């Protein structure tokens, strides 16, 4: 059953990506469409063995959206998520730190644009903790078993955080996709 849900998610986001791509051909200056496209790419990246390329593509689409509408809070938040995800996937500490810093900057801008968003504020808090999570925390107990336990907890926490970021991205992308599919009322 879980595999069926995964396949359905894959199909939904692949469809959203194709729709956004077709819409882009008609109107390349639609910031909302670019944001939906990037959200779909971020979700699809979860199904890739090498997700970094798809995340970079999402970052480019979000960059385009922000050139069109620099105050688009959901695009600011999504690009922050993309950088956060990219940082966690990076084995190079400098590259990871750079991406965590960019994520923090974009989350801060999203908070400034929509200060009432608890999700944006929590994302900003998470981004500030990302470097420590990425390195596995600071040196702690001298006992090997205690150290192993701490690493396991840190690793589990890292995956929990990454899961919540992905879930939040999924919710935003789904809402954006649903909003784009609502019929226009005629008056």
Swiss-Prot record:
The gene is TOM20-4. Induction: Up-regulated after antimycin A or rotenone treatments. A motif (AKR2A-binding sequence (ABS) required for mitochondrion outer membrane targeting) lies at residues 179-187. GO terms for molecular function: protein-transporting ATPase activity. Expressed in roots, flowers, young cotyledons and leaves. Central component of the receptor complex responsible for the recognition and translocation of cytosolically synthesized mitochondrial preproteins. Together with TOM22 functions as the transit peptide receptor at the surface of the mitochondrion outer membrane and facilitates the movement of preproteins into the translocation pore. Residues 1-160 are cytoplasmic. One of its GO terms (biological process) is protein targeting to mitochondrion. InterPro entries: TOM20_imprt_rcpt (IPR010547), TPR-like_helical_dom_sf (IPR011990). TPR repeats lie at residues 84-117. It comes from the Eukaryota. It is a single-pass membrane protein. Disruption phenotype: No visible phenotype. Triple mutants tom20-2-tom20-3-tom20-4 are vible but display a slightly delayed flowering time. This is Mitochondrial import receptor subunit TOM20-4. The modification N-acetylmethionine is found at residue 1. Keywords: Acetylation, Membrane, Mitochondrion, Mitochondrion outer membrane, Protein transport, TPR repeat, Transmembrane, Transmembrane helix, Transport. GO terms for cellular component: mitochondrial outer membrane translocase complex; plant-type vacuole; plastid; TIM23 mitochondrial import inner membrane translocase complex. Residues 179-187 are mitochondrial intermembrane. The chain crosses the membrane at residues 161-178. There are four genes (TOM20-1, TOM20-2, TOM20-3 and TOM20-4) which encode mitochondrial import receptor subunits TOM20. In mammals and fungi, the transmembrane domain is located at the N-terminus while it is located at the C-terminus in plants. The overall orientation of the protein in the membrane is therefore inverted.
